[in-house]
Protein backbone atom coordinates (compact mmCIF):
# COMPACT_ATOMS: atom_id res chain seq x y z
CA UNK A 1 0.00 0.00 0.00
CA UNK A 2 2.84 2.37 0.86
CA UNK A 3 4.48 1.63 -2.48
CA UNK A 4 1.30 2.42 -4.40
CA UNK A 5 0.86 5.69 -2.50
CA UNK A 6 4.51 6.66 -3.03
CA UNK A 7 4.31 5.93 -6.74
CA UNK A 8 1.14 7.93 -7.17
CA UNK A 9 2.66 10.79 -5.18
CA UNK A 10 5.23 11.15 -7.96
CA UNK A 11 2.41 12.38 -10.22
CA UNK A 12 4.24 10.98 -13.23
CA UNK A 13 2.02 9.69 -16.04
CA UNK A 14 4.84 7.40 -17.21
CA UNK A 15 4.96 5.39 -13.99
CA UNK A 16 2.00 3.29 -12.86
CA UNK A 17 1.85 1.03 -9.80
CA UNK A 18 0.48 -2.49 -10.06
CA UNK A 19 -0.04 -5.52 -7.84
CA UNK A 20 2.03 -8.62 -8.57
CA UNK A 21 1.19 -11.75 -6.58
CA UNK A 22 3.63 -14.30 -7.96
CA UNK A 23 1.72 -17.55 -8.51
CA UNK A 24 -0.80 -19.92 -6.95
CA UNK A 25 1.96 -22.03 -5.39
CA UNK A 26 3.56 -19.11 -3.51
CA UNK A 27 0.50 -17.01 -2.59
CA UNK A 28 -2.29 -18.09 -0.23
CA UNK A 29 -5.97 -17.94 -1.13
CA UNK A 30 -6.52 -15.12 1.36
CA UNK A 31 -3.60 -13.12 -0.04
CA UNK A 32 -4.89 -13.60 -3.59
CA UNK A 33 -8.32 -12.34 -2.60
CA UNK A 34 -6.84 -9.34 -0.79
CA UNK A 35 -4.67 -8.46 -3.81
CA UNK A 36 -7.59 -8.79 -6.22
CA UNK A 37 -9.89 -6.65 -4.07
CA UNK A 38 -7.24 -4.00 -3.47
CA UNK A 39 -6.49 -3.86 -7.20
CA UNK A 40 -10.20 -3.38 -7.95
CA UNK A 41 -10.63 -0.74 -5.25
CA UNK A 42 -7.61 1.23 -6.44
CA UNK A 43 -8.03 0.51 -10.19
CA UNK A 44 -4.64 -1.19 -10.37
CA UNK A 45 -3.28 -3.74 -12.78
CA UNK A 46 -2.98 -7.26 -11.35
CA UNK A 47 -0.18 -9.33 -12.90
CA UNK A 48 0.85 -12.88 -12.08
CA UNK A 49 2.29 -16.13 -13.40
CA UNK A 50 -0.25 -18.78 -14.42
CA UNK A 51 0.12 -22.39 -15.59
CA UNK A 52 3.83 -22.02 -16.26
CA UNK A 53 4.65 -25.66 -15.51
CA UNK A 54 2.90 -29.01 -15.50
CA UNK A 55 3.71 -29.42 -11.80
CA UNK A 56 1.83 -26.22 -11.00
CA UNK A 57 -1.26 -27.62 -12.73
CA UNK A 58 -1.06 -31.04 -11.09
CA UNK A 59 -0.47 -29.57 -7.64
CA UNK A 60 -3.46 -27.25 -8.03
CA UNK A 61 -5.68 -30.13 -9.09
CA UNK A 62 -4.52 -32.14 -6.10
CA UNK A 63 -4.97 -29.32 -3.56
CA UNK A 64 -8.03 -27.56 -4.97
CA UNK A 65 -9.74 -30.10 -7.22
CA UNK A 66 -9.46 -27.89 -10.29
CA UNK A 67 -6.98 -26.38 -12.72
CA UNK A 68 -5.22 -23.05 -11.95
CA UNK A 69 -7.30 -20.65 -14.07
CA UNK A 70 -10.54 -22.13 -12.74
CA UNK A 71 -9.18 -21.82 -9.20
CA UNK A 72 -8.34 -18.13 -9.63
CA UNK A 73 -11.76 -17.53 -11.14
CA UNK A 74 -13.44 -19.34 -8.25
CA UNK A 75 -11.75 -17.10 -5.68
CA UNK A 76 -12.52 -13.90 -7.60
CA UNK A 77 -9.16 -13.01 -9.14
CA UNK A 78 -9.79 -12.99 -12.90
CA UNK A 79 -10.84 -9.74 -14.52
CA UNK A 80 -10.13 -7.19 -17.27
CA UNK A 81 -7.29 -5.54 -15.34
CA UNK A 82 -5.35 -8.81 -15.11
CA UNK A 83 -2.32 -10.08 -17.01
CA UNK A 84 -1.57 -13.80 -16.79
CA UNK A 85 2.04 -14.53 -17.74
CA UNK A 86 3.23 -17.75 -19.38
CA UNK A 87 0.04 -19.83 -19.76
CA UNK A 88 1.99 -22.70 -21.29
CA UNK A 89 -0.07 -25.42 -19.62
CA UNK A 90 -3.50 -23.83 -20.02
CA UNK A 91 -6.09 -26.09 -21.61
CA UNK A 92 -8.75 -24.94 -24.10
CA UNK A 93 -11.42 -24.48 -21.42
CA UNK A 94 -9.12 -22.31 -19.31
CA UNK A 95 -8.14 -20.20 -22.31
CA UNK A 96 -11.82 -19.67 -23.13
CA UNK A 97 -12.43 -18.68 -19.50
CA UNK A 98 -9.60 -16.13 -19.55
CA UNK A 99 -10.95 -14.68 -22.81
CA UNK A 100 -14.45 -14.47 -21.30
CA UNK A 101 -13.09 -12.62 -18.26
CA UNK A 102 -11.05 -10.30 -20.54
CA UNK A 103 -7.76 -11.37 -18.95
CA UNK A 104 -4.70 -10.59 -21.07
CA UNK A 105 -2.26 -13.44 -21.62
CA UNK A 106 1.48 -12.73 -21.88
CA UNK A 107 3.61 -15.22 -23.82
CA UNK A 108 7.20 -15.21 -22.50
CA UNK A 109 9.00 -17.51 -24.98
CA UNK A 110 12.62 -16.89 -24.02
CA UNK A 111 11.90 -17.51 -20.35
CA UNK A 112 9.85 -20.61 -21.15
CA UNK A 113 12.70 -22.03 -23.22
CA UNK A 114 15.37 -21.25 -20.64
CA UNK A 115 13.42 -22.65 -17.70
CA UNK A 116 12.41 -25.79 -19.58
CA UNK A 117 8.67 -25.59 -18.92
CA UNK A 118 8.05 -28.72 -20.99
CA UNK A 119 5.67 -27.43 -23.65
CA UNK A 120 5.32 -24.66 -26.21
CA UNK A 121 2.84 -21.85 -25.70
CA UNK A 122 -0.61 -22.80 -27.14
CA UNK A 123 -0.74 -19.93 -29.63
CA UNK A 124 -3.41 -21.39 -31.91
CA UNK A 125 -5.84 -22.02 -29.02
CA UNK A 126 -5.31 -18.53 -27.60
CA UNK A 127 -5.80 -16.91 -31.00
CA UNK A 128 -8.94 -18.97 -31.66
CA UNK A 129 -10.42 -17.98 -28.29
CA UNK A 130 -9.94 -14.30 -29.05
CA UNK A 131 -7.99 -13.58 -25.87
CA UNK A 132 -5.81 -10.47 -25.77
CA UNK A 133 -2.35 -11.94 -26.43
CA UNK A 134 0.78 -10.00 -25.55
CA UNK A 135 4.51 -10.76 -25.60
CA UNK A 136 6.79 -10.39 -22.60
CA UNK A 137 10.34 -11.09 -21.50
CA UNK A 138 9.84 -12.19 -17.88
CA UNK A 139 12.58 -11.04 -15.51
CA UNK A 140 16.20 -10.79 -16.60
CA UNK A 141 17.17 -13.70 -14.34
CA UNK A 142 14.76 -15.96 -16.25
CA UNK A 143 15.79 -14.72 -19.68
CA UNK A 144 19.32 -13.26 -19.56
CA UNK A 145 17.86 -10.39 -21.56
CA UNK A 146 14.98 -7.94 -21.68
CA UNK A 147 15.13 -7.69 -25.49
CA UNK A 148 11.58 -7.43 -26.80
CA UNK A 149 12.65 -7.91 -30.42
CA UNK A 150 14.21 -11.24 -29.51
CA UNK A 151 11.03 -12.28 -27.68
CA UNK A 152 8.91 -11.24 -30.67
CA UNK A 153 10.99 -13.40 -33.00
CA UNK A 154 10.87 -16.40 -30.66
CA UNK A 155 7.10 -16.08 -30.17
CA UNK A 156 6.51 -16.02 -33.92
CA UNK A 157 8.86 -18.93 -34.62
CA UNK A 158 7.39 -21.19 -31.95
CA UNK A 159 3.88 -20.52 -33.26
CA UNK A 160 5.02 -21.60 -36.71
CA UNK A 161 6.66 -24.75 -35.35
CA UNK A 162 3.40 -25.99 -33.86
CA UNK A 163 1.00 -24.84 -36.55
CA UNK A 164 2.09 -23.58 -39.98
CA UNK A 165 4.71 -21.36 -41.65
CA UNK A 166 2.21 -18.50 -41.87
CA UNK A 167 1.09 -18.63 -38.22
CA UNK A 168 1.67 -15.46 -36.18
CA UNK A 169 2.86 -13.34 -39.09
CA UNK A 170 4.80 -10.08 -38.75
CA UNK A 171 1.67 -7.92 -38.39
CA UNK A 172 0.22 -10.14 -35.68
CA UNK A 173 3.52 -10.31 -33.84
CA UNK A 174 3.89 -6.52 -33.89
CA UNK A 175 0.31 -6.10 -32.64
CA UNK A 176 0.97 -8.49 -29.75
CA UNK A 177 4.06 -6.51 -28.74
CA UNK A 178 2.52 -3.05 -29.12
CA UNK A 179 -1.24 -2.61 -29.52
CA UNK A 180 -2.23 -5.61 -27.41
CA UNK A 181 0.35 -4.75 -24.78
CA UNK A 182 -1.02 -1.22 -24.53
CA UNK A 183 -4.54 -2.62 -24.17
CA UNK A 184 -3.39 -4.95 -21.38
CA UNK A 185 -1.79 -2.05 -19.53
CA UNK A 186 -4.75 0.25 -20.03
CA UNK A 187 -2.75 2.71 -22.13
CA UNK A 188 -4.23 4.77 -24.95
CA UNK A 189 -1.38 3.79 -27.26
CA UNK A 190 -0.45 1.25 -29.90
CA UNK A 191 -1.59 3.27 -32.92
CA UNK A 192 0.13 6.13 -34.71
CA UNK A 193 -2.79 8.52 -35.02
CA UNK A 194 -4.01 11.88 -33.63
CA UNK A 195 -4.99 11.76 -29.98
CA UNK A 196 -3.03 8.62 -29.10
CA UNK A 197 -0.03 8.64 -26.80
CA UNK A 198 3.17 9.11 -28.79
CA UNK A 199 4.76 5.90 -27.52
CA UNK A 200 7.33 5.64 -30.30
CA UNK A 201 10.82 4.32 -30.94
CA UNK A 202 13.11 4.53 -33.96
CA UNK A 203 14.62 1.29 -35.25
CA UNK A 204 17.71 1.32 -37.48
CA UNK A 205 17.03 -1.38 -40.07
Each model region followed by its residue ranges:
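Short beta->alpha connector loops at strand-helix junctions that form conserved
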Residues: 108-109, 137
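His/Asp/Glu-enriched, well-ordered alpha-helical/loop segment
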Residues: 74-81, 123-205
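Conserved beta-strand positions in the central sheet of alpha/beta enzyme cores
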Residues: 47, 85, 106-107, 202
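Conserved active-site and cofactor/substrate-binding residues in soluble primary-metabolism enzymes
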Residues: 2, 14, 26, 30, ...
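Alpha-helical segments flanking ligand/cofactor-binding loops in enzyme cores
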Residues: 33, 37, 70, 95-96, ...
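Metal-coordinating catalytic core of metallo-dependent amide/deamination hydrolases
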Residues: 1-89
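Catalytic core of soluble alpha/beta enzymes
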Residues: 52-103, 113-125, 139, 143-149
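Glycine-enriched alpha-helix->loop->beta-strand junction motifs that scaffold or abut catalytic
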Residues: 36-45, 77-80, 97-106, 128-133, ...
Amino acid sequence: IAGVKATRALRCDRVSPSIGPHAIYTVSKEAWQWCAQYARDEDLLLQYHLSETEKEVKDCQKLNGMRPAKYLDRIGVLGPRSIAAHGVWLDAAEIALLAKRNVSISNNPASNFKLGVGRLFPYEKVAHAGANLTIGTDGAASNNSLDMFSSMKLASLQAKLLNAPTAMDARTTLDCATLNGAKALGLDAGFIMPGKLADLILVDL
